[in-house]
Curated annotation (Swiss-Prot):
This is CBL-interacting protein kinase 30. GO terms for molecular function: ATP binding; protein serine kinase activity; protein serine/threonine kinase activity. The activation loop within the kinase domain is the target of phosphorylation/activation by upstream protein kinases. The PPI motif mediates the interaction with the ABI (abscisic acid-insensitive) phosphatases. It comes from Oryza sativa subsp. japonica (Rice). ATP binds at residues 23-31, 46. Belongs to the protein kinase superfamily. CAMK Ser/Thr protein kinase family. SNF1 subfamily. Induction: By drought and salt stresses and abscisic acid (ABA).
Length: 476
């Protein structure tokens, strides 16, 4: 790093800040605790490698992060003090949040009691409302991006994927898919254009659920089920949620962005307006954590006991086909699937073998079933495969030449997982795995081209969060 060294071998940046311990690292930056030499004040310094930023094409993203942080001065948003640069490094000098990540505090408890969860949620909503009033949409809200100061107050951070009003197209919508899968709104998944404010509100709803429950509302091992649950807002509240909290969540996690609750309406709700008391007066651990051991069964029982009118209202909203639209993230500099590919909490290892043993592949697309079948037929014809259209969205391809284990036989199955979104599974049903790998690399992947939204498996991004209702795992 471009740092001066004092006689005591301390690392000093530009004669002004003494660098301390590493707090965290991202793809292109590291964050350190540091001290201002003139005053001894603790700060956090985010250090970017200029060459890596330029090589990755994320220069505009870094500039946007600076612009956003200079716009947003709020007690619940991490403050940017100054920006410095040398030939090889860029330094963001920021407010230091000594309480660490909210995620870390949550991981030490099975869940938060409702008064504690409400306190954090109130602070989050006031911060998000202020950002929106300044034309800033965060687009990656999650517990890992919520820090705590010495008093335990919440601070929103990491505006690297944020958007400004100036990024809207002529239709007044954002079109870059980004964010972290489990927290991303359905309309972002559908990738047609979305209101950044409404997408942030959905993420706030997921965060509130996590604070109250200790696990994610949408967290399935099966990609098809995951997509469907998110787009239909299919989740279950555990029995310890109050009626008012459940009603608020139903409005926050409304799959239709046009009818999803607004921030002003959130603030008007009696549940939100309840006065908070200092954290010192509240237990940070739920009084009956043992209930988590049977949370799935308890949730199912509680669902049966829900108020009929409320349940009907939720079911009606779940069936809405949205008129607006990542994961995500699809790179503006990085987008939904790219971010997903970096998420260690996502795992398709059971479905996809290592590259040398590949016998299956899966991709998502926004093309119609007819277009998908037509393209697969073209691929079969070009590769001298026979082609058979089977029932229930399945097609079969069979090679004309025998390999070491006979002719290569392939089956493709098409699943509709959301409005205008299909997932296609392609698997070897006969022949040799090396022949399938050659087919995948040389014929299938190149021929599909732009028809594919994203590949899952092998050298491409995995998509599925690991484990159903478990305590949340950290997502990058």
């Amino acid at each position: 790093m471009a740092m001066e060294t004092t006689s005591q071998d301390s690392q000093v940046i530009m004669g002004r800040y003494k660098l301390g311990r590493l707090l965290g690292r991202g793809t292109f930056a590291k964050v350190y605790k540091a001290y201002k030499l003139a005053t001894g004040e603790a700060v956090a310094i985010k250090v970017f490698d200029k060459e890596a930023v330029q090589r990755s094409g994320t220069v505009e993203q870094v500039k946007r992060e600076v612009d956003v942080m200079r716009r947003v001065h709020h007690r619940h948003v991490i403050r940017l003090h100054e920006v410095m640069a040398t030939r090889s490094r860029i330094y963001f000098v920021m407010e230091y949040a000594s309480g660490g990540e909210l995620f870390t505090r949550l991981s030490r408890s099975p869940r938060f009691p409702e008064p504690v969860a409400r306190r954090y949620f109130q602070q989050l909503i006031t911060a998000v409302e202020f950002c929106h009033s300044r034309g800033v949409y965060h687009r990656d809200l999650k517990p890992e991006n919520l820090l705590l100061d010495a008093r335990g107050d919440l601070k929103v951070t990491d505006f690297g994927l944020s958007a400004l009003d100036g990024g809207l197209r002529g239709d007044g919508l954002l079109h870059t898919t980004c964010g972290t899968p489990a927290y991303v709104a359905p309309e972002v998944l559908l990738k047609r254009g979305y209101d950044g404010a409404k997408a942030d509100i959905w993420s706030c709803g997921v965060i509130l659920f996590v604070l109250l429950a200790g696990y994610l509302p949408f967290n399935e091992t099966n990609l098809v089920i995951l997509y469907r649950n998110i787009t239909e807002s299919n989740y279950r509240c555990p029995p310890w949620f109050s009626v008012e909290a459940r009603k608020l969540l139903a409005r926050l996690l409304d799959p239709n962005p046009k009818t999803r609750i607004t921030i002003s309406k959130i603030m008007d709700r009696p549940w939100f307006q309840q006065a908070t008391c200092p954290l010192g007066d509240m237990s940070l651990v739920a009084s009956a954590p043992s209930v988590l051991l049977a949370r799935k069964e308890a949730s199912q029982q509680h669902d049966d006991e829900e108020d009929d009118g409320f349940a009907r209202e939720k079911k009606k909203r779940s069936n809405v086909i949205m008129s607006s639209p990542v994961i995500d993230v699809r790179p503006s500099s990085m987008n939904a699937f790219d971010i997903i590919s970096r998420s260690r909490g996502l795992d398709l290892s059971k479905m996809f073998d290592a590259e040398e043993r590949r016998s299956e592949a899966r991709f998502s697309t926004r093309e119609t079933t007819t277009a998908i079948v037509s393209k697969l037929e073209e691929i079969a014809e070009a590769g001298r495969f026979s082609f058979k259209l089977k029932e229930k969205g399945r097609v079969e391809l069979e090679g004309s030449q025998d390999g070491r284990k006979g002719a290569l036989a392939i089956e493709a199955e098409i699943f509709k997982v959301a409005p205008e979104v299909h997932v296609v599974e392609v698997r070897k049903t006969g022949g040799d795995s090396p022949d399938f790998r050659d087919f995948y690399k040389q014929e299938l992947k190149p021929s599909l081209g732009d028809m594919v939204w994203a590949w899952q498996g092998g050298d491409s991004p995995p998509l599925v969060p690991a484990a159903g209702r478990r305590p949340i795992t950290k997502r990058s």
